[in-house]
Amino acid sequence: MDIPQGGVIMNHFALALRGLNCMGCARKLERQLNQDLTVEIETLTPTSIELHTHATLNEVLTSIESLGYQGGTEQTYQLQGLNCGRCVNKLTTHLSAQAEIAKLHVSKERLSLVTTLTAEQVKALVAEVGYQAIEAEQESTFAPAASIDEKETDTPDAENSSNTEATEASSQTLSLLIKGMTCASCVASVEKALLSVEGVQSAQVNLTEQSALVRGIFANPQPLLNAIQSSGYQAEILDDPAQQQAKQQAQLEALQKEHKQSALLGIALGTPLMLWGVFGGNMMIRNSSDQMVWGGIGTICFALLLTAGRHFFMNAWQALTHGRATMDTLVALGTGAAWFYSMLVVAWPQTFPDAARHVYFEATAMIIGLISLGHYIETKAKSNTNRSLQALLNLQPQQATLVTEQGDQSIAVADIQLGMSLRIKPGEQVPVDGVVSTGHSYLDESMLTGEPIPVLKEAGAKVAAGTLNQDGSLVITATGIGAQTMLARIIQMVRQAQSSKPAMARLADQISSVFVPVVVVIAILSAALWYLYGPDPKASYMLVVATTVLIIACPCALGLATPLSITVGIGKAAEMGILIRDANVLQTASQVDTVVFDKTGTLTLGKPSIQSLHVLQGDENQLLALAYALEQQSEHPLAKAICDYAKQRNISPVEISQFTNQRGRGLLADYQNQTVLVGSLAFMQEQGIDLSMAESTLEKFAAQAWTPVAVAYRGMLQGVLAIADPIKPTSAQAVRKLNELGIHTVMLTGDHTSVANAIAKELGISQVIAQVLPDQKAQHIQALQQQGRKVAMIGDGINDAPALALADIGIAMGSGSDVAIESAQMTLLNSSPTSVVSAIELSKATLRNMKQNLFGAFIYNTLGIPIAAGVLYPAFGFLLSPVVAGAAMALSSITVVSNANRLRWSKISFDQHSQ
C-alpha cells in the first residue's frame, strides 16, 4: 500500500528476512539500507522488516542481498490460459508494473516471483489480464531442498516442455483427515467422491489412519471437502504432519471412549438377559404380566439403541441416503429387526403362533455391546500402528537455542529462519537441518538411519533434524527448515507410502465394495427360504437367520486386512532407516530373486584412500611431498586420496613449476629443474620409466585389486602408492545372507574386470559384469529381466539412475545423488548393504501378514455366512445364535488387527530394534 509522506508517494513494504542471526545483523542491515536508499523503518527484527521508501522492491532487495541476506516471500504458481509468447509478454508487462513484485519470471506454464503481496492478490493480478494462477506446491520427496529448488526453477527452455511434465511438476499432494469411515465400503465411497473432483489425479484413502492423500492440480481445495461431505462424511485439510498426527490421535481416542461406553452399556444390559435365558428363564410372551415385564425391558433396549447404538443407525441412514450400504447397515438392520420383532410380539402376541412368541432383546443388547467392544479393542490397536510415525514426529524439539551477539536466546523451532546460527548442547536433539560451523561432537543418527554407531560431526559436516547430540557442543547454520528438513520429508514419504495400496489390497477393496449389498441379499434370501420351507415357528426362525447373517458378516475385517499390514510394515521399515516410496514395492520386493549391486559407494565406501606405500628412492615424506605437490592441482578422484593422506601425515608439498596435466594419464611438473611424474603405470612406461624394480610389489597390489599410482623423479621410479576404495564393513554380511536366502547376487560396475573380480571373490558375489559404461547399465538390467529374473538394483550415483528406474525394484543409498534417490522406489538412509537384506525380509514378512489377514477374513466370511444362514440345521439341527454371531464378528476384526501388529515383532536380519 502506498502512503503520502511530505507530499510525495512512498512505497510501503513488509518483508520476511532470512540469514540474519541477531539484532546486530539487523542493525547492520539498517545502516546498509540508509546508505543505499532513503528509508523510514517502522519495525525491524532478524526475521522481518517493515519500511517506507521511494525505492522499488527490486532496489530494496538488492540492498539486502548485498550483505548476503535475503528478503521477501518467494511464490510459485502454475499458469493456465497462456498459449504463446505474446501472452507471456502481456502478463510480464502487467506484473512488472507492480512495485511490490521483484525477481519476476513468467513462462507459458509457470510464474515465479518475490513479492510482499498475498497469494490471493497475485492471483487477482493475473486474473486481471485474463489468465489463471494456481499455487504450485512441489510434492514432498526424499531429496535435499536444493534439488527440489532446481526442479522448480524455470529455464529458457521451459516453454518447450511437454504439458505432461508441467502438470506433474505442479501437482499438489493434500492430506485430509476424514471422519465417519467404518469399513471398506466407506473407503470405496470416499475414493470415488474424491476422484470425481476436477483436477484430481489420484486419491489414496486409508481406513486405519482415517485419512486420504489426494494428488492433483487444485485452484481451490474446497471442492474436495464438498465431495466428501456430499458422500456423507466429514473432512478437513491438514498440512502440518504434527497437527495431523495429533488430530488423528484425538479422533482415535474419542472413538475409543465412545466404543468403550457403548460396550459397557450393551454388555451390562445384555449379560443378565442372556443368562436369564441360558438358565431357563422365561423369554416367551404368554400372558399380560409377561407383556408388561418384557415391554419395560424392550423400552430400556430402545433407549440403548438410541444411545450406545445411535452411531450404527445414524451411519446406516447416512449411507442409505447416499445410495450405499456399509458395515453399520448390517448392524443396524440386524439389531433393529431383532428389537422390532420382539416389540411386535410384546404388543400383539395373539398375532403370532405360540411357539413364535419368543423375544430377542438380549440379542439386541449383546450385539451392540460385543461389536462395540470389538471396535474399542480394534481402535486401541490402530493407535499402535501409527507408533512409528509418532516416534518420527517426536524427534523434533519444540525449542532451540539461537546464537546472537547479545548471547544465546531460546527460540521456537517454528520461528527458525535459514542462515540462523543455533547452538546444540550435549543431550539435545538437532532442531533443523544444518551445517556445523564450530565445535565437534558425536551424533546419534539411529532414529533416522537405523545405524546404531554415533557419527562424528565437525566443522563443515551436515546434520539432520531429529538426530541426538551426545557429549560435545556444536554451533550449526540452518540450511533446511520446516517441510524441507530431511525429517519432514521422511515423515511425508512414510505417510504417502502407508496410504498407497499394492495390487492385492486393491483387489480386496473391490471385493469389499460389493460385500455389504451381497450380504443383505443373502440375508433376505435366507429369510425367505426359512419362511417358505423352514419348521415352525417360521417367523421366529426367519428373524433369527436373517439377523445372524447380517451380524456375522464382517466387511470390517476385509477392509482392515491389508491397510493395517502396510501401515505397520512401512512404519517398521522407517524405524530401520528404510524409506519405501509406494506400498507396491513391498509386494514386488518379496518376489526378488536377483540383487544387482553397483560397486562404488554401494559395496565400497566411495572414498578412495591410500592402502599401502612402497618407497624405492629416498623416504616416504619426500615421496609424499612430491606426489602432493602435483596432485593438489588435479581434479582426478584419486588425487584427493593422496592429498588427504599427505595432510594426515602433516606433509607439506614442495614448490613446483611448469605443471602439466595429461588428462587420464598422469601429471608432469618441474622441481629443482628436474621433471617429476605422477600417474599410472602406462604413463610411466610412455615416459621411459623402468618399473622392473617394483614388479613384485605391483603384483601384490594387483592381487588385492589396489590401483597403483607411481611417482618418478630425475628419470627414476621413486615409489608407488596403492589406492583402493575400501569395502564397507557390512558388504560381506549382506552378500552372505542374500546367498543363504537363495538370491542371485551380481556386481555391475564400470571398474576394471580384475578389480571387480577381486572384490566379488572377497565378498562372495556370484556374477560380475565389469567395465560397463554408464548408459549400458540399464541394458544389463534388462538382459537379466529377459532371463525371467525379478531384479533389484542397488546404486547411489547419477549413472545408476536409468538402471534403478528400469529394475523391478530400484534401491538407492541415502548418501547417493538426488537423481538416484528420485529414480528409486526404496531409499536406505544408513547406506548399508545389509539394509537390502532387511528390506527384502521385511517385504516378505509384510506380504505374508497381508495374505494371512486376507485369508482369515475370507475364510471367516465364507464359512460364517452359510452357517449363519442355517446350512448345518438339516443335518445337525444346529442354528447359530445372533449373540454368538456378534461375538464372532468382533473377534474377526480383533484377530486381523492383532495379527497385523504382530508384524512389528517379526525377526528381521540386521534389525537393531529386534535384536
Curated annotation (Swiss-Prot):
SUPFAM superfamilies: Calcium ATPase, transduction domain A (SSF81653), Calcium ATPase, transmembrane domain M (SSF81665), HAD-like (SSF56784), HMA, heavy metal-associated domain (SSF55008). The keyword Chaperone does not apply. Pfam families: E1-E2_ATPase (PF00122), HMA (PF00403), Hydrolase (PF00702). Its EC number is 7.2.2.8. It comes from Vibrio cholerae serotype O1 (strain ATCC 39315 / El Tor Inaba N16961). The gene is copA. This is Copper-exporting P-type ATPase. One of its GO terms (biological process) is copper ion homeostasis. Involved in copper export. It is found in: Cell membrane. GO terms for cellular component: membrane; plasma membrane. Residues 11-72, 73-134, 172-236 form the HMA domain. Mg(2+) binds at residues 796, 800. Cu(+) 3 binds at residues 183, 186. The active site is at residue 598.
